[in-house]
């Protein structure tokens, strides 16, 4: 399959998720000429803001954070070489749910309260429009248990299946996605990245053992080397300035909790549906489009 023929769709919950988990993958395939689409389910209105400059944007104050984060997402995707952002059923249709048990999760517009048939139909429409060869979203736990990530997993899984059938006829002609992946963090790779951290801002701290989410190495099916685009990934992280701070080294970042994390140079995935392409000696793919033909 030629690079220009490749089509990749990523479904993420909030602005910044696309860069933190899959930024290198987006940049790598975009740089190779693939058509990369990022579909974001909410505006991230409930995000915790870093610093005082944007503190008044939060939900309890001006409630303007979501609109501001559209601009951050646009800048991040530009840094990664991807197309302009797309939002599920249009920007603002679904609101960031925050965490389970918080007042924001009870909002009728919260993504966690979405009518599943409506949300699935909206993803089906995008799949049938762009006809991706590869779709990526989260694993069943949403990576770290956030309800919006879990919801994104559920609706994307249902949509990939439904898009190949006669369901939702109003959403276009059926399309069967050849390969469907979950984005994950490999445990040993994360541990090596943390061990390599030697300097970081004095108000940051190293994570406690097991504090950052990861999966067993044996669960990983696919490893994408993103060293060649790591600077683009760092620039995209910096674009999400209300949520992310990149260390002066350019090799680490932290969220509002000031827990330092490595900017990983290999991004990992689990093939959830489809056929594994060619693998290396470790049994892992090195190309999301491996085994596919135009």
Curated annotation (Swiss-Prot):
Catalytic activity, reaction form: 1D-myo-inositol 2-acetamido-2-deoxy-alpha-D-glucopyranoside + H2O = 1D-myo-inositol 2-amino-2-deoxy-alpha-D-glucopyranoside + acetate
Any single GO BP term: mycothiol biosynthetic process
Molecular function GO labels: N-acetylglucosaminylinositol deacetylase activity; zinc ion binding
Top EC class of this enzyme: hydrolase
Gene3D superfamilies: LmbE-like
Manner of cofactor binding, per the entry note: Binds 1 zinc ion per subunit.
Keyword Zinc: yes
Binding-site positions, Zn(2+): 14, 17, 149
EC code(s) of this entry: 3.5.1.103
Pfam families registered for this protein in UniProt: PIG-L (PF02585)
Cofactor(s), by name: Zn(2+)
UniProt KW keywords: Hydrolase, Metal-binding, Zinc
Keyword Transport recorded: no
Superkingdom as given in the UniProt entry: Bacteria
Coiled-coil annotated spans: none
Protein family membership: Belongs to the MshB deacetylase family.
NCBIfam families named among the record's database cross-references: mycothiol_MshB
Function: Catalyzes the deacetylation of 1D-myo-inositol 2-acetamido-2-deoxy-alpha-D-glucopyranoside (GlcNAc-Ins) in the mycothiol biosynthesis pathway.
The protein's name: 1D-myo-inositol 2-acetamido-2-deoxy-alpha-D-glucopyranoside deacetylase
Originating organism: Rhodococcus erythropolis (strain PR4 / NBRC 100887)
Gene: mshB
């Amino acid at each position: 399959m030629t690079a220009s023929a490749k089509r990749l769709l990523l479904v993420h919950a909030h602005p910044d998720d696309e860069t933190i988990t899959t930024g290198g993958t987006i940049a790598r395939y975009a740089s190779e000429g693939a058509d990369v689409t990022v579909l974001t389910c909410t505006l991230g209105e409930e995000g915790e803001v870093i610093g005082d400059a944007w503190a008044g944007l939060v939900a309890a104050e001006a409630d303007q954070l979501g609109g501001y984060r559209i601009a951050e997402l646009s800048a991040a995707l530009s840094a990664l070489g991807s197309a302009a952002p797309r939002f599920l059923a249009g920007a603002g249709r679904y609101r960031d749910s925050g965490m389970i048990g918080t007042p924001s999760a009870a909002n009728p517009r919260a993504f966690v309260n979405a009518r599943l048939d409506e949300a699935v139909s909206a993803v089906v429409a995008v799949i049938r429009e762009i006809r991706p060869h590869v779709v990526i979203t989260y694993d069943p736990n949403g990576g770290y248990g956030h309800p919006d990530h879990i919801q994104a997993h559920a609706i994307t899984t249902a949509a990939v299946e439904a898009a190949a059938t006669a369901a939702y006829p109003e959403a276009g002609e059926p399309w069967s996605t050849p390969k469907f992946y979950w984005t994950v963090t490999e445990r040993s790779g994360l541990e090596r990245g943390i061990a390599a951290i030697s300097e970081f801002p004095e108000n940051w701290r190293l994570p406690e053992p097991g504090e950052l989410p990861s999966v067993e190495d044996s669960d990983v099916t696919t490893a994408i080397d993103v060293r060649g685009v790591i600077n683009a990934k760092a620039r995209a992280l910096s674009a999400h300035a209300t949520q992310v701070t990149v260390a002066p080294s350019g090799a680490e970042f932290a969220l509002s909790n000031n827990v330092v994390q490595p900017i990983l140079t290999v991004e990992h995935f689990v093939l959830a549906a489809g056929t594994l392409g060619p693998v290396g000696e470790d049994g892992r793919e090195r190309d999301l489009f491996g085994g596919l033909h135009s």
